[in-house]
Regions:
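Conserved beta-strand hairpin/beta-sheet module of binuclear metal-dependent hydrolase folds
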Residues: 1-42, 149-165
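Glycine-/small-residue-rich active-site loops that bind phosphorylated ligands and cofactors
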Residues: 23, 60, 212
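Metallo-beta-lactamase
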Residues: 28-30, 83-141, 145-216
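Active-site HxH/HxHxD metal-binding segment of metal-dependent hydrolases
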Residues: 32, 40-120
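Binuclear metal-ion centers of metallo-dependent hydrolases, dominated by the metallo-beta-lactamase
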Residues: 212-227
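Residue-level marker for buried hydrophobic side chains located in beta-strands
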Residues: 22-24, 53, 76, 156-158, ...
Length: 227
């Protein structure tokens, strides 16, 4: 399955092809036009986009969604457990850093933005069959309460912020598996990582850095510090 990766200043956005194109995550506030320009370079017009799917409700992942919806008419979908974050236009104050880099980055994270009302919310999993891909999201809480990943039929996994790659937003050693910068629940995060490692995937496409080879994730998970 063809995956288009758009690397923005704060986070990655992915496009996958169903009946129409599906945009997974939307970057930070103001990133909508950059996503559309990148899509156009691949011959994708706004009318070709049929869904905006959010892996979770942090501002660096939903910030551009309203702009994308206004330009494409595509609905926005997110797990119900993160609905309040979108409606309040904020990141949760309960975010806890997983290491020094997360502590250093906290002051620079976008903490508030314009509230967003999604078009669709889901409990558990979201079925993408109506959009032309025979798969469902998998709920992987920990980074956020509603964090979800998307396994694709060909063995790729759109993994959001379940892990990150390398350092400095993936600019340094971007294919090295590392824990996310922040979590809301460390125990849930550890359980979700194990759940995702049980999915039939060979490559994880993540929000910061990547992609990550599953064999590298498994090797790294044998040592302390990944979850």
């Amino acid at each position: 399955m063809h995956i288009i990766t758009i690397r923005l200043s704060l986070a990655n956005v992915f496009l996958v092809r169903g009946e129409r194109w599906i945009v997974i995550d939307s970057g930070a506030p103001g990133d909508g036009p950059a996503i559309l320009r990148a899509a156009a370079r691949h011959g994708i017009a706004p009318a070709d986009i049929g869904l905006i799917l959010l892996t979770h409700g942090h501002i660096d992942h939903f910030g551009g969604a309203a702009e994308l919806r206004a330009s494409t008419g595509a609905p926005i979908a997110v797990h119900r457990a993160d609905l309040a974050l979108l409606r309040e236009g904020r990141n949760p104050t309960s975010l806890r850093s997983t290491g020094l880099e997360g502590q250093l980055l906290r002051p620079f994270l976008p903490w508030r933005t314009t509230p967003l009302e999604p078009d669709m919310t889901f409990e558990g999993s979201f079925d993408l069959s109506p959009f032309g891909i025979a798969t469902r999201t998998v709920h992987t809480p920990g980074h956020s309460a509603g964090h979800s990943v998307l396994p694709l039929p060909d063995g790729n996994l759109i993994a959001g912020d379940l892990l990150r790659g390398g350092f400095l937003g993936g600019r340094l050693r971007g294919r090295l598996p590392n824990p996310p910068y922040v979590v809301t629940d460390a125990a849930q995060q550890a359980a979700s990582l194990q759940l995702a490692l049980g999915l039939p995937a060979h490559t994880w496409h993540i929000g910061h850095g990547g992609p990550l080879a599953v064999e590298h994730i498994r090797a790294r998970a044998k040592r302390p510090g990944l979850a």
